[in-house]
Amino acid sequence: MGLKRTVRNTLCWSLASGLILLGYIKRTRQKALRDNAIISFYFHNPNRKLFRKLVAWFKDNGYTIISYDELIDIINKKIACPGGAVWISLDDGWKENLDNVIPVVVEYNIPVTFYICTDAVENGMFWWTKAKASSRLLPRELRQAEALRRLPEQQRKQIINQLNQLTPPDAYEREAMTVDDVRYISSLPQVTIGSHTISHPVLPNCTDSEIDYEMGESKKKLEDWTGKPVKSFSYPNGVFNGNERQFLEKHGYELAVTDEGRFADLNDDCYLFPRADIMDDGSFAENLCHALNVWEPVIKRFKRIIKLGR
């Protein structure tokens, strides 16, 4: 971890610890246990200590961790929403999830949903980490993943394909699950599999045919690999513009999840279901504030105060 990131995490830990001491978590907990609110948050590649500590905290404090099927039944008003409902998911399909997440899932017997990016499963790496590792081969203006994310999808794919051709398949260590790994976690009674597209594109940069392919083909592959229906979708990068809805409907998805950090409720659009983003390298205190929808409102308030003071 670089110095800037270390400083950032230390400052955020201090702020989060202060918010906890000031009773923000306690008040939010009372609201979550009282109202028909669903606490929804997701990870990418957490270490085992962070994942276990968050799971244990919610289990020990009277929350109910619900499965994907229970979530859908609650949304469709087939069952009542329990007080303090929590739904947990993970994006991408990182191989380290097998060592850091799955043992905790089995130990605590908690349901989780994995949103899998199929291209990374088949090729071993996620495109943004390959771009970073091979940045010396890119033009200077495209050496940051954010610059590549701004490109039209066809152009981004061409660049990544060129990098694949210029680097041998075994040049980098595998970071994504294998097909057998996906089959294995899908066989666990606690796990549900969802789609995270094929290539993890920025969907608003895609043509209609590209969106159609990303949503349809990833679903088909995951269903072929697992032998189970894939009914939900996670927007890559949390980015969307509304054009995706027609393809979600076409391919039979019943839920699509975002990275909007707030509680979900029974009136939410099923294709814009919110989830708070857990920081893989952040502290427990900061991430508890993220999960319980404390962090974002406070940060927005600070930003408004700073803006008014200028």
Predicted regions span which residues?
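C-terminal active-site subregion of NodB/CE4 polysaccharide deacetylases
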Residues: 1-88, 95-96, 127, 133, ...
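Short, glycine/acidic-enriched loop or turn micro-motifs at the edges of active sites
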Residues: 94-95, 199
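Electropositive, surface-exposed helix/loop patches at the edges of structured domains
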Residues: 98-111, 148-158, 162, 290-310
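Metal-dependent polysaccharide deacetylase catalytic core of the NodB/CE4 family, i.e.
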Residues: 41-44, 83-86, 106-239, 270-273
